[in-house]
Amino acid sequence: MITLNNIPLSFLYDVPKAVDHKNIILNLIQKIPPNKYNAISHTDVNLPEGFHREYTIYFLKNIYQQFKQKFLEHLGETHMDLHNIWFQWYNQNDYHPWHVHPWCHFTN
């Protein structure tokens, strides 16, 4: 295993009840009115900061907290920041050009 300063660089986290969470989150996303942006069929990336995003509340409460705890334990750290959450729903022929975001170190 590759390490950096004795910290293993690989980390695997299986979300408990992932399929159930996925279905709930997809249903919550579908409550957001259709919002095409560039060549993406549906997203909230361009909606106002104060726009109600029920899926983020669900994600933070039911997935993120447990993930964060395990990830920080793995790193031997006590703090990490989450700056933003958004979704992008792609249909056939949708696309988004390659790009990077400052302060983003992983996505899924």
Predicted regions and their residues:
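Catalytic core of non-heme Fe(II) oxygenases with the double-stranded beta-helix
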Residues: 84-108
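Non-heme Fe(II)/2-oxoglutarate
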Residues: 1-77, 95
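A short coil-to-beta-strand element that immediately follows conserved catalytic motifs
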Residues: 75-85
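Generic internal hydrophobic packing segments that stabilize the cores of diverse globular domains
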Residues: 60-68, 83-87, 105
